[in-house]
């Protein structure tokens, strides 16, 4: 029934198995990949005919995690998986980025890659395995894919690189880096680091590249056994069209790409394109070519003109040389009622970034295969259509926005204070108000400034820069702070963020083979120079966190109570804590270990809530004076509520200094009184006194009264002696 083929290797001390021919046999390519006890299924299906009217690769990649993989049932009313989680979206992009450049030019068939997590062993993260499985499925499918690729995760623990660290080891690592590529080239890097040097980061990339070579060999072995016949792809030769078009519009196109202002440049390029279209489609004549084909040739010519200009003259589209960063203006405190805000402008890219501080109630609960956890740092990136001068539909968050937000999150996360030192939930929102390249890195710079403006004590300010590359044969140019056009028309998009001490995040997408270690080394060094320059410009606005939190931010006080007192503070059905919150106006959060966080923008509310909670959770001390309320009057004395929920008896003899005939002569129910704790009787009942406390000032009179009594006792004795 089944025609099963498989390969198995030892990889990083664990078995990796790739199998095909048993599951999903109607897909063009299907591979079940197993690493440890984590299992994923990758499938590839491509349409039989090209999609009409498109000049791009119609590829979609979907990664999905099933709750059953971890022996769990999904939450929610419907008890089934819903829309993609952030993790699923990010891993979908992680798979997409290294495989997309490897499809043959001209492939226009609708292609879908679906990777499903079937089993998760709580040790091996499925994301890298998903990349390997997708690569294997594509290699078997017969679609024109110039792979396979391999992938690996690299950690850095105790000054040593670690291949595919298990989940428990991730808490110790100074680096989490995922790298993917072919046998001879790195194509993609995604990472977060704790201020590591350029040398360590580059070493990690090359370490990962070396160690996923056995995976590539295993995929090739499997393909030799089970790959389908390659699909035919007819490549159209457009060289004659390009030659004719070059002679027609080269000079005008070069002039258009010398215009520094983006909107003016686009208008000029549009006119040149209209001229080219008119030439190839003269009125009244039967067209020889498809319009989409001519538009594609023009697009290729645009790329070549920009690349030639840079390599031949050293001048870029906006007139800069390869190392110059665009003009920067950083401002903080730009919004009056927010907790922290910044406006970061770099050339024609601008980000309005806002920080909001919240309490434990604002933490995000994240449901993942490895369990539910609370996230206290959120960074959201929004890219509205007006930022590029276009109209568009506003709807749900797009994959690109999620990916760019996570990149900025990774850049900032390593420099945040530990949560136990700064117990706030932090949300940063970056609104891209203008965009012409590296808006994600503008978000990093703006986020750093907005956080410091809010009073968040970052280890160091953080900045980011996007690098590009033009490579033609032996000639290359590394570009600092790339424009949008340089991103689209170049060979590499290389984003580096960090502090003056080191790198916190590195993301790399390479579109061609042949990027050597030496080129990456040059790019990292140039990126460091650019990052230090940007940090200097940012410091003109703010160079460290403000000493005080923003005026409108909540204040949080943290203290501990005994765990056996938590129930008393919360009360039956939450009655006591609700009363504390309602009457003081403060937010109260109590954790299982007895940590109490009290938050309010009003300092008096915090003091009142803390006093109330401590009065419940603490034990009263003998000899201390407390304020209380008379709750019951009896013949033999009065019961006073004096320490949270605690009551004690003021005996009639302790009500006042003189003889008291009736308790009600001195106090009545509801009276506010000051009492001193005398101690406890044999039955543990609390003994209080009012007569030894000045009811106006709260002064302890016991010592004074004893001294007076002693003096009165000595006077009669002296008189008797005389």
From Swiss-Prot:
The keyword Nucleus does not apply. Residues 623-691 form the S1 motif domain. Residues 701-713 have a biased composition (Basic and acidic residues). Its EC number is 2.7.7.8. Keywords: Cytoplasm, Magnesium, Metal-binding, Nucleotidyltransferase, RNA-binding, Transferase. InterPro entries: ExoRNase_PH_dom1, ExoRNase_PH_dom2, ExoRNase_PH_dom2_sf, KH_dom, KH_dom_type_1, KH_dom_type_1_sf, NA-bd_OB-fold, PNPase. It is found in: Cytoplasm. SMART domains: KH, S1. This is Polyribonucleotide nucleotidyltransferase. It comes from Rhodopseudomonas palustris (strain ATCC BAA-98 / CGA009).
